[in-house]
């Protein structure tokens, strides 16, 4: 008699995705972040659902409702801080997952890669709208500053901003719609994840060598299920250490002050995972130019398959490209640091140089170095 997991219509899909899936025998720990992102999404949806049961999306009561969750709801503080710090873990996993794809040339699966970039945009939008919900000072001013960027769009800009606001400033209508979008987007993300996996399983996983691994495949279960469990344990350990020991480490103290449209915080800045993009935005003196640079700083990921000029897929055997890649990573750290600094000398010029380097490495230096390596290998 045949096994139910191989015949049952539903169990068959799960079997082909997580059990009998042929996987390369040599994928490293860098391949763990896909499953960790799935876990992060589940944690965020569950904690978010419980928070939504007690949260009120009204300007008068939003801040108080978050305080009520932390003080009066059973383990409300735990749920709230798991959700807030879960977002940080989500972003760390995202950056490492994308970085892995760049290093090992996974972007040559361009449907999987492009859906991944769309997912990145969707997660960033969700995180931004979630940051507005507690209705603290940084929530309010962050929403005001970021939505105002759309006014840089010629002709329709101002109308568009007022349409998004639902009025002439960030107010009750804005908060209510942001809550609605923040609630629905994670489910759209979950659906996109399915499509992401669908396209990935058409080709199978890449591996560190970048070579075709069809001749050497092993079943996903038990080998990679047990490996994923190790990743899960480390992620949960890190998240819980953060939540239980220093839950406000990555937050902004300004968000413990209720939103006040009459006083502006001295330094308006987003959550740490947006600081690199914020630094790029601020490094251009022109409003429209800054907005375009901000969008392009993420959209540039879609160009990776076109900019790949090396004869090898992975960077595993390309030491020159490796050096350039790690310089680019260091540049990202520099941008993150600059994004959190005030707009004054010497931070302005450092931010501008780091922004130029960020784009130049991707558009010019990496493709050039790839061609040099081809020549060195007489290809």
From Swiss-Prot:
Protein family: Belongs to the cytochrome b family.
Coiled-coil positions: none
Key words, A-Z: Electron transport, Heme, Iron, Membrane, Metal-binding, Mitochondrion, Mitochondrion inner membrane, Respiratory chain, Transmembrane, Transmembrane helix, Transport, Ubiquinone
Gene Ontology terms, MF aspect: metal ion binding; ubiquinol-cytochrome-c reductase activity
InterPro entries, per the entry: Cyt_b/b6_C (IPR005798), Cyt_b/b6_C_sf (IPR036150), Cyt_b/b6_N (IPR005797), Cytb/b6-like_sf (IPR027387), Cytochrome_b (IPR030689), Cytochrome_b_C_euk/bac (IPR048260), Cytochrome_b_N_euk/bac (IPR048259), Di-haem_cyt_TM (IPR016174)
Residues annotated for heme b b566 binding in this entry: 97, 196
GO cellular component: mitochondrial inner membrane; respiratory chain complex III
Pfam families: Cytochrom_B_C, Cytochrome_B
Residues at which a ubiquinone binds: 201
Co-factor: note: Binds 2 heme b groups non-covalently.
Highest taxon of the lineage: Eukaryota
Signal sequence annotation: none
Originating species: Spermophilus relictus (Relict ground squirrel)
Main subcellular location: mitochondrion
Quaternary assembly: The cytochrome bc1 complex contains 11 subunits: 3 respiratory subunits (MT-CYB, CYC1 and UQCRFS1), 2 core proteins (UQCRC1 and UQCRC2) and 6 low-molecular weight proteins (UQCRH/QCR6, UQCRB/QCR7, UQCRQ/QCR8, UQCR10/QCR9, UQCR11/QCR10 and a cleavage product of UQCRFS1). This cytochrome bc1 complex then forms a dimer.
One GO biological process term: mitochondrial electron transport, ubiquinol to cytochrome c
Residues reported to bind heme b b562: 83, 182
Protein location: Mitochondrion inner membrane
Name by which UniProt lists this protein: Cytochrome b
Membrane-spanning residues: 33-53, 77-98, 113-133, 178-198, 226-246, 288-308, 320-340, 347-367
Protein topology in the membrane: Multi-pass membrane protein
């Amino acid at each position: 008699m045949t096994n139910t997991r191989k015949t049952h219509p539903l169990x068959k899909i799960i079997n082909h995705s997580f059990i009998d899936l042929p996987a390369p025998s040599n994928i490293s720990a860098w391949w763990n972040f896909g499953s960790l992102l799935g876990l992060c999404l589940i944690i965020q949806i569950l904690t978010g659902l419980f928070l939504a049961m007690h949260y009120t999306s009204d300007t008068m009561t939003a801040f108080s409702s978050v305080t009520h969750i932390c003080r009066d709801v059973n383990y409300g503080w735990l749920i709230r801080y798991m959700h807030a710090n879960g977002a940080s873990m989500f972003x760390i996993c995202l950056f490492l997952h994308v970085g892995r794809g760049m290093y090992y040339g996974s972007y040559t699966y361009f449907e999987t890669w492009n859906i991944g970039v769309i997912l990145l945009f969707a997660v960033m939008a969700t995180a931004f709208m979630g940051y507005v919900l507690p209705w603290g000072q940084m929530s309010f001013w962050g929403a005001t500053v970021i939505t105002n960027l759309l006014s840089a769009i010629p002709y329709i800009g101002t109308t568009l901003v007022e349409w998004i606001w639902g009025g002439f400033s960030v107010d009750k209508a804005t908060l209510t719609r942001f809550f609605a979008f923040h609630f629905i987007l994670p489910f759209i993300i979950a659906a996109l994840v399915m499509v992401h996996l669908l396209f990935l399983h058409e080709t199978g996983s890449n591996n560190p060598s970048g070579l075709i691994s069809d001749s050497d495949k092993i079943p996903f279960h038990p080998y990679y299920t047990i490996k994923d469990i190790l990743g899960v344990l480390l992620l949960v350990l890190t998240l819980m250490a953060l939540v239980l020991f220093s839950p406000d480490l990555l937050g902004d103290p300004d968000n413990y002050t209720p939103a006040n449209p009459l006083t502006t915080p001295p330094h308006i800045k987003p959550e740490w995972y947006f600081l690199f993009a914020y630094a790029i935005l601020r490094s251009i003196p022109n409003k429209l130019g800054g907005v375009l640079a901000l969008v392009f700083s993420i959209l540039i990921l879609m160009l990776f398959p076109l900019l790949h000029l090396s004869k090898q897929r992975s960077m595993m055997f390309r030491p020159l490209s490796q050096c350039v890649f790690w310089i680019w990573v260091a540049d990202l750290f520099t941008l993150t640091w600059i994004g959190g600094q005030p707009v004054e000398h010497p931070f302005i010029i450092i931010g501008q140089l780091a922004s130029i380097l960020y784009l130049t490495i991707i558009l010019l230096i990496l493709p050039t170095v790839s061609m040099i390596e081809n020549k060195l290998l007489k290809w």
